[in-house]
Amino acid sequence: MGEGHKKLNFSDCMGLAIGQIIGSGIMVLTGIVIGLTGHGIAAAFILGAVLAVITCVPFIILTSAIPSSGAGFTYIRRLMGEKAGFMYIAMFVLSQVLIATYAKGFASYFCSIFPQFGESAVAMAALVICTAINLIGLKSSALVQKGMVVLLLLSLFLFIVFGLPKVSWDALTPTVSNLMPNGPKNFFTGVALLSFACGGAKFVAENGDDIVEPSRTIPKVIVLSTSIVAVFYVLIGIVAGGVLPVETVAFQNLTLVAQEIFPTWLYLFFVFGGAVFALLTTLNGTLSWVTRGLQAAAKQGWLPEKTAEENRNGVPAILLMVFFLMGAIPILTGMDLTLISNMGVGTDMVTEFMVLLACWRLPDIFPEEYQKSAFCMKKRTLHILLFFIGILIIGTSYVNLSDLTVPAAIACGIYILVMFVYTQVRYPYVKAKQEKKEDK
C-alpha cells in the first residue's frame, strides 16, 4: 500500500481480524474436539482463546517496536538471521498439511448429502480443482470471499439460535468427569487445536506498515477481536456438544446436530451455504496466497531461481505444486482429520516459538525502537515473561505432536533434519548472492 492510499484504522483492523479468525476451520475442528473433550468443549474454547492471545504476546511486542509487513518471516530474518528465516518458512510449509483439512472437511459435508461418493475421492477432486483454478489465475474475488464470510456467519448464528433452546443443560454440569472425560492430555490437545481456530488476528500484523499507529492499534485489535469471536465460538460449542449425546457427535462434523435442530430447508442451507461453500472458498483462497513466503525465499536464493518464476497468469506454478502435495499426501495416505490437525497445529506452534526467540533478542538488536515501544519493560521482565510463554508454547506443541502416529512422526523428523542440513549447505550461496546484489 503506497503513501497515497488511506491507512487502516482501528475499525478497519477489527473487521480484518474478525474475518481472519472466523473461518471454516470451526466447521472441521468442533467435532474433533468434542471427541477429545466431551462436554468440556465450551471450557476448551475459552482456554483456546486465552492461549491464542498469550501466544500472540511476542508478536504484539515485536509489532509495537518494529511494525513491519511480512511480520513473522521478517522478524525472524532481522533478529535471528537468514538461516533461521528459511527454517521458519520450512516449518510453515510443513504446517500446511492443514490444507488437507479444508479438502477433507469439504468432502465430509458434501458426502453427508451425497453419500454415494467416496470422501477421499471428493477431497482430492476439490484439491485438484482449486489448484487448477489458481494455476490459471482465477483467484476468488474479494466479493466472493466477503460473501463466504457472511454466509458462514449467518449459518453459525442460526446454529446458535436454533440450537440453544434444545441443549440438555443438565448434561453440561461443570464437573471434572464432564470437562475431562478422556483425561487431561486429550483435553489440552483439544485446547491446543481450538487455539488455532481462535487464532488469526495476529495476521493483522502482516499489514504493519499500512496501519495507523500500529504499535497501539495491533495489540488492541488482537486481544479484542479474539475475545469477541471466543464468545461466539463458546455458544457454538455448547450447541454442538449439548443437543445430542457426546458419543453420537464425537469426531463427527456438525451435520448431525444441524439435522436435529433445523427444518430441512435450513439444514440444506447450513450444509451448502455455510459449510460446503465456506470450506471450498477457504481452500481456494489459501492456495492463492500460501506461496508468497516461499517465493520470497526462492528469490533470495534459498531455492533454484526457476522455482520463483511465475507462469503467464502470474502464478509461481512450481511452488503452488509444493503446497498441492502438502494437501494431497495426507488425503492419499488416509490420514484422518485429527492426525492432520495435530501435525499442522503442532508444527505451527514451532513457528510461534521461533517468533518468541526473535522477540527475546529484540532489546539487544533494536534497543532504541524497543525503548520507544508501547510495551517496553525491563529486559529481565521481558525474558521472564517470554520464558513462561515459551513453556506454554512448547507444551502445546508437545500435546499435539505426541499424538502423531509413528510413520507421521518419523516423516516430520526426517523433513526437519533434511531442511536443517539443506539450510547449512545452501547458506553460502545465499550470502554470496546478497553480497553481489549489494555491490551493484
What residue ranges belong to the model's regions?
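Hydrophobic transmembrane alpha-helices that form the core helical bundles
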Residues: 32-35, 44, 54-135, 271-296, ...
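Membrane-interface "cap" regions at the ends of multi-pass membrane proteins
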Residues: 1-31, 36-40, 52-53, 57, ...
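Transmembrane helix-loop junctions in multi-pass membrane proteins
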Residues: 26-30, 102-106, 133-139, 246-247, ...
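Helix-loop-helix junctions that connect adjacent transmembrane segments
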Residues: 3, 42, 115-118, 146-268
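Membrane-interface loop-to-helix entry segments
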Residues: 109, 119-169, 181-182, 222-227, ...
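Select transmembrane alpha-helical segments in multipass membrane proteins
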Residues: 6-17, 81-94, 125-126, 181-194, ...
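TM-loop-TM module centered on a large, flexible mid-protein loop between adjacent transmembrane helices
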Residues: 74-76, 81, 112, 223-284, ...
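C-terminal membrane-solvent junction of multi-pass transporters and transport-like membrane proteins
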Residues: 144, 306-317, 352-406, 429-440
